[in-house]
From Swiss-Prot:
MF term (GO), any: copper ion binding
Name of the protein this chain belongs to: Phenoloxidase subunit 1
Post-translational modification: The N-terminus is blocked.
Entry EC number(s): 1.14.18.1
One BP annotation, GO: melanin biosynthetic process from tyrosine
Species of the source: Manduca sexta
UniProt cross-references to PANTHER family, sorted A to Z: LARVAL STORAGE PROTEIN/PHENOLOXIDASE, PHENOLOXIDASE 2-RELATED
Binding site for Cu cation A: H209, H213, H239
GO CC field: extracellular region
The keyword Transit peptide appears for this protein: no
Length: 685
C-alpha cells in the first residue's frame, strides 16, 4: 500500500506527458489497460507499451476498475486554462475531487488517476488530485510537489523556458548551468508599481497563495473538506495580513498605501503585462491595459453571464448585514453576528464558499471580483481570449489590482471589526506579568538588515517532452539576516505561569512621515511570531530565533529542495515525510526597508495562555506556520480573535500605540536597513 501511495506522486511529474511514458528519474512506467488509452493512441497501445516499458526500471500495473462518470470534469477542454474563481470550473473540480475522494483504496485511486491524466485538463487534474491527497486518510504524509516545480510557467518569465529547453537538449545532465530569471521583467522603472514587483512577483509568495487555497478549497461535494475550523475568519486574516505587508512594502519604497477598488464602475488605473506563457494552453497570458473597466460578462464557454451591477447589490447587502449585525438566512430569519463567530460567518459569505450561510442572497462578491478583473480584455469572448492572471490563485498576487481588490474586501471586514466593543483592560492585561523590554539581537542592536539573495528552483519536472535530468532556474528575491528577539519579563505572582507571546511590527510613521493614531497603525501591524512560553517566578529572559516564526515556512519547504528530502533525490519515495507547504515564505518575513533605515516599531504582548489555549493533541501535525494557515485536521491553536489585540479599534480615535500599552506589553523602535547587494543562498548573515 505504501508503494501505491508513493506512486501517486508520479502523476505530478511532467504533467503534459501521458502517464504511459516514463516518469521520474528512475524511469517508472504505468502499465494501463488497453481501453484506458485515449482514442488517438488506442491502435498503438502495444507499440507504446513496449516502447516505453522496455527501458523502464519499474513497472506499475494499473488495476482494471469500473470507471466513474467523468462527463462533468471533462467539459473543460484539455488545453484551456483552469480557474477556481469561475463557477463552472469550480463545479467541475468539485466533481473530480468527489470522484478521487470516493475511490475505495489507493489502488483504485491510482487507476482512476491514470485514466484521468490522459483526458482531464492538466491544471484541474493537478489541483483535484492535490486536494484529494491532502484530505484522504490513506494518503496523508505524502508531500505534494510544489506547483512551481510542476507548472513553472505560472511563476517566471516565459523566455526562461526557451533557454531551459535548449540547455536540456544540448547539455547532459550534471553539467547544466542554472538558467537566470531576471529580477525585473514585467515593466521598467518609469512604472511606479514596479518598485514593489519583487513582492508581487515573488515565487514564494505566489506559492503561498496557491497552497492556502489548496488547503482551503471553497467547493466540494464533501462538505468536511471545506468546513474547517474558523475557515472564514482565516480567509479574512490571511488576506488582511497580505494587505498589511504589501502596504508596508509600498511605504518602504516611497509609494502611498494601496487604494481600495470600491467603485466598480471606475477605470482601473494600473495596467499589468505579466510576461507569462501557459504551456498547457499554448497561449500568452493576456495583459490588462491601464484604464480598463469592469464590463458585463457574457461568456457562454465559461457559463458566466453577469451584470456589473450585481457586485454593487452584493456589496450593499453585505454592508447592510454589518450595520444590522445580523445576516439574512434563506428561511427569512436573521442570524446575529456576535463578536466571536461573526467574522467567521462574514468570511464565508465574502469568499464565498459552499458553507456561506446564504449564498443565494449575498452572492459571490470576492470570487466574482477576481473574475471581472480577469476578463476586462474580453468580457464577451469575442476574441476567444482566456482569463488574465487575476483568474488564477497561483498568479493573482502578481497583479497590482489584486491588492486594490483585497483592500476593498478588507475595508468591508474592518467596518464590522470597528463596530465591536474595544478590548477592555481585563481582556488585555495579564495580572502579575510585566514585560520590561523587548529588543532585537543581530549584527547591530534593534536593526534588521535586508538584501537580495539568489536561489534556485528545479524546472526539470515541468519541462515536458525534453531529455531528463535536473534543470535549475536561478532567481533573485528579498532576504534578511537572521536575528533573535530578546524579551525581559517579570512574573510577580510567586507561581509558575504560561503565557502566549505575540510579536508584531508596524511602520512608526505614515506615508507623509507623520505619527499615526492607533486605529491607523493597527491595520499595518504585521504578525511576526506567536508562541507559548513558561514563566517562572521572578525575572525571565526569553530568546526566540526569527527562523522559528509561527508565520513562515523555510525555503526548503516553500521550494521542496530535493536535497532536503530523505532517500534518493528525484524518487517518489523521497517525498514522503511530515511536511506542510502552507505558510508565508520565510525570506519575506521582514519588509525591504530603506538604505537609510526604515523606522518601525516592534511590539510584544504576553497574554494568559489559560485564556488562549485550545485543548488538542498536536503530535505529528503540521503546525509550524499556524498563524496564517491553521493546523491540518486540528482547531486553530489560539482561542483569541485572529490578529488580537489589533483586530479592534480603541474608543478614542486620537489615541496612539503608547496609550494602548498595558504592563504585559512593550515596544521598541527599530530600523530596517536595506543593502542593495546580492548574495548566493547560504551566504547571508
Amino acid at each position: 500500500m505504501t508503494d501505491a501511495k508513493n506512486n501517486l506522486l508520479y502523476f505530478f511529474d511532467r504533467p503534459n506527458e501521458p502517464c504511459f511514458m516514463q516518469k521520474g528519474e528512475d524511469k517508472v512506467v504505468f502499465e494501463i489497460p488497453d481501453h484506458y488509452y485515449p482514442d488517438k493512441y488506442k491502435s498503438l497501445s502495444n507499440t507504446l507499451s513496449n516502447r516505453f516499458g522496455n527501458e523502464a526500471t519499474k513497472r506499475i500495473p494499473i488495476r482494471n476498475i469500473t470507471l466513474p462518470n467523468l462527463e462533468v470534469p471533462m467539459q473543460l477542454p484539455y488545453n484551456d486554462q483552469f480557474s477556481l474563481f469561475v463557477p463552472k470550473h469550480r463545479t467541475m473540480a468539485a466533481k473530480l475531487i468527489d470522484i478521487f475522494m470516493g475511490m475505495r483504496d489507493v489502488e483504485d485511486l491510482q487507476s482512476v488517476c491514470s485514466y484521468c491524466q490522459l483526458r482531464i485538463n492538466p491544471y484541474m487534474f493537478n489541483y483535484c488530485l492535490s486536494v484529494a491527497i491532502l484530505h484522504r486518510p490513506d494518503t496523508k504524509g505524502l508531500s505534494i510537489p510544489t506547483f512551481a516545480e510542476t507548472f513553472p510557467d505560472k511563476f517566471m518569465d516565459s523566455k526562461v523556458f526557451l533557454r531551459a529547453r535548449e540547455v536540456s537538449n544540448v547539455v547532459i545532465s550534471g553539467s547544466r548551468m542554472p538558467v537566470n530569471v531576471p529580477i525585473n521583467y514585467t515593466a521598467n522603472t518609469t512604472e511606479p508599481e514596479q518598485r514593489v514587483a519583487y513582492f508581487r512577483e515573488d515565487i514564494g509568495i505566489n506559492l503561498h497563495h496557491w497552497h492556502w487555497h489548496l488547503v482551503y478549497p471553497f467547493d466540494s461535494a464533501d462538505r468536511s473538506i471545506v468546513n474547517k475550523d474558523r475557515r472564514g475568519e482565516l480567509f479574512y486574516y490571511m488576506h488582511q495580513q497580505i494587505i498589511g505587508r504589501y502596504n508596508v512594502e509600498r511605504m518602504c519604497n516611497g509609494l502611498p498605501q494601496v487604494k481600495p477598488f470600491s467603485d466598480f464602475s471606475a477605470p482601473i488605473e494600473e495596467g499589468y503585462f505579466p510576461k507569462l506563457d501557459s504551456q498547457v494552453a499554448s497561449r500568452t497570458w493576456p495583459p490588462r491595459f491601464a484604464g480598463s473597466v469592469f464590463r458585463n460578462l457574457d461568456r457562454t464557454v465559461d457559463q458566466v453571464k453577469i451584470d456589473v451591477r450585481k457586485l454593487f447589490t452584493w456589496r450593499d447587502q453585505f454592508l447592510e448585514a454589518i450595520q444590522k449585525m445580523a445576516i439574512k438566512m434563506p428561511n427569512g430569519r436573521e442570524l446575529p453576528l456576535d463578536e466571536v463567530t461573526g467574522i467567521d460567518m462574514l468570511g464565508n459569505l465574502m469568499e464565498s464558499s459552499i458553507i456561506s450561510p446564504n449564498r443565494g442572497y449575498y452572492g459571490d462578491l470576492h470570487n466574482m471580483g477576481h473574475v471581472f478583473a480577469a476578463y476586462t480584455h474580453d468580457p464577451d469572448h469575442r476574441h476567444l481570449e482566456q482569463f488574465g492572471v487575476m483568474g488564477d490563485s497561483a498568479t493573482a498576487m502578481r497583479d497590482p489590482f489584486f491588492y486594490r481588490w483585497h483592500r476593498f474586501v478588507d475595508d468591508v471586514f474592518n467596518i464590522y471589526k470597528e463596530k465591536l466593543t474595544p478590548y477592555t483592560n481585563e481582556r488585555l492585561d495579564f495580572p502579575g506579568v510585566r514585560v520590561s523590554s523587548v529588543g532585537i539581537e543581530g549584527a547591530r542592536p534593534n536593526t534588521l538588515r535586508t538584501l537580495w539573495q539568489q536561489s534556485t528552483v528545479e524546472l526539470g519536472r515541468g519541462l515536458d517532452f525534453t531529455p531528463r535530468g535536473s534543470v535549475l532556474a536561478r532567481f533573485t528575491h528579498l532576504q534578511h539576516d537572521e536575528f533573535q528577539y530578546v524579551i525581559e519579563v517579570n512574573n510577580t505572582t510567586g507561581g509558575n505561569l504560561m503565557g502566549t507571546v505575540r510579536i508584531f511590527m508596524a511602520p512608526k510613521v505614515d506615508d507623509n512621515g507623520q505619527p499615526m493614531s492607533f486605529n491607523k497603525q493597527r491595520r499595518l501591524m504585521i504578525e511576526l511570531d506567536k508562541f507559548s512560553q513558561a514563566l517562572r517566578p521572578g525575572t525571565n529572559t526569553i530568546r526566540r530565533r526569527s527562523v522559528d516564526s509561527s508565520v513562515t515556512i523555510p525555503y526548503e519547504r516553500t521550494f521542496r529542495n530535493q536535497s532536503e528530502r530523505p532517500g534518493d533525490p528525484g524518487t517518489a519515495g523521497a517525498a514522503e515525510f511530515d511536511f506542510c507547504g502552507c505558510g508565508w515564505p520565510h525570506h519575506m518575513l521582514i519588509p525591504k526597508g530603506t538604505a537609510q533605515g526604515y523606522p518601525v516599531v516592534l511590539f510584544v504582548m504576553i497574554s494568559n495562555w489559560n485564556n488562549d489555549r485550545i485543548e488538542q493533541d498536536l503530535v505529528g501535525s503540521c503546525n509550524d506556520a499556524a498563524s496564517y494557515c491553521g493546523i491540518r485536521d486540528r482547531k486553530y491553536p489560539d482561542k483569541q480573535a485572529m490578529g488580537y489585540p489589533f483586530d479592534r479599534k480603541m474608543a478614542n480615535d486620537a489615541a496612539t500605540l503608547s496609550d494602548f500599552l498595558r504592563p504585559n506589553m512593550a515596544v521598541r523602535d527599530c530600523s530596517i536597513q536595506f543593502s542593495d547587494t546580492t548574495v548566493e543562498r547560504g551566504q547571508q548573515g
